[in-house]
Swiss-Prot record:
Pfam families registered for this protein in UniProt: MMR_HSR1, MnmE_helical, TrmE_N
Record bears the keyword Hydrolase: yes
EC number annotated for this UniProt entry: 3.6.-.-
Keywords, ordered alphabetically: Cytoplasm, GTP-binding, Hydrolase, Magnesium, Metal-binding, Nucleotide-binding, Potassium, tRNA processing
Amino acids binding (6S)-5-formyl-5,6,7,8-tetrahydrofolate: 23, 80, 120, 454
Xref: HAMAP family: GTPase_MnmE
A GO term from the CC aspect: cytosol
Needed co-factor(s): K(+)
GO biological process: tRNA methylation; tRNA wobble uridine modification
Oligomeric and partner information: Homodimer. Heterotetramer of two MnmE and two MnmG subunits.
Binding-site list for K(+): 226, 245, 247, 250
Protein name, per record: tRNA modification GTPase MnmE
Amino acid sequence: MNTTDTIVAQATPPGRGGVGILRVSGPKAAQVAEVVLGKLPKPRYADYLPFRDVDGQILDQGIAIYFPGPNSFTGEDVLELQGHGGPVILDLLLKRILTLSGVRIANPGEFSERAFLNDKLDLAQAEAIADLIDASSEQAARSAMNSLQGAFSTQVHQMVEALTHLRIYVEAAIDFPDEEIDFLSDGKIEAKLDEVIVELERVRSQARQGSLLREGMKVVIAGRPNAGKSSLLNALAGREAAIVTDIAGTTRDVLREHIHIDGMPLHIIDTAGLREASDEVERIGIERAWQEIEQADRVLFMVDSTTTNAVEPVEIWPEFMARLPKSLPITVVRNKTDMTDEETSIAEVSGYSLIRLSARSGEGIDLLRDHLKETMGFSSNTEGGFLARRRHLQALNTAAEHLQQGHEQLVVARSGELLAEELRLAQQALSEITGEFTSDDLLGRIFSSFCIGK
């Protein structure tokens, strides 16, 4: 990426709208203002001005705001042109700006990337911008804003700072081995290390909640034909998302619904009934069902309670259980309690959760919702929380592993050198979250997923 270029892009969504915004950032932002507006607006004041073409004809009239660097979003000179949101008008204005030498269309996320490179925000905050735009619930939006304001980054910086001081202490013990006090055995280093480990575990717990808010949980409903899978999908979705009939095999393909349970995104997938296929279409549907099952976070094993009294999954359908990945969590759902003597309930059977409900009447659905929240460790009370991505969780987990290994080196091996190395690696892992230690390749992948105008 050439950061000496001046970049321009539409900051509002494509299509028609009341207002359309073009954003310019770079050393020629002031020149763009001079040629398009005929003047350089007073910094940080809104000016209502005509936007002119190369020949001086007025293309549009609107608001122009000039932010000289470094006091701007990107840290560079920034010009925003807010005109009417017609695609033709905005395209003409964009072409006019691009006639200037040294001005080009921005790459996806390049405005945010320049803000990061100019220390206007760290990497976790930059990612929070995209997460705020993509938020699918009020809770996710609030958590993304907390991240943007530094709720996550501040905690990471504090842990990095604590590790820095700890490393200084440890390396002093290594450099001055003849001191009267044995730094490695007097308990001070271990106490400080334990404090960081406890704090890291607290942040990891928050990050897991933030990851659930951002990415949600993939739940696949699977079972034999006519077990009530589509009825359960409709009950969870709160609408008639799937066709329901008494004919076995009504669902031939994968159906997806995205809902929220107290703020937790849930990706529910209804699948074709699993049996020996009667035709090619059904065979393909069953193959797709198994593909979804193998990629699920949890499987709801639907059982028609009018056909069996069994509650053990292996007893209900041994072939199904044999094919499931061993590490895949399942919940057995005995459906159609409205047609049997069973009461709606939840219990544990041989290590599996068993829920009795009626998808048709809705009895027991709240039990299932609470169960899904509990199994994912989701708490709806996340005030002050932040959003987290998979890479954040991976970095936190890596840091935790190095701190545990460092603790062993301190307590068991009494090796200052090995402890110092584990602390360094933990610090490096945490620094990857905020971008203090990050490869160019990772930066490219992160910012390329952003909107063009961000």
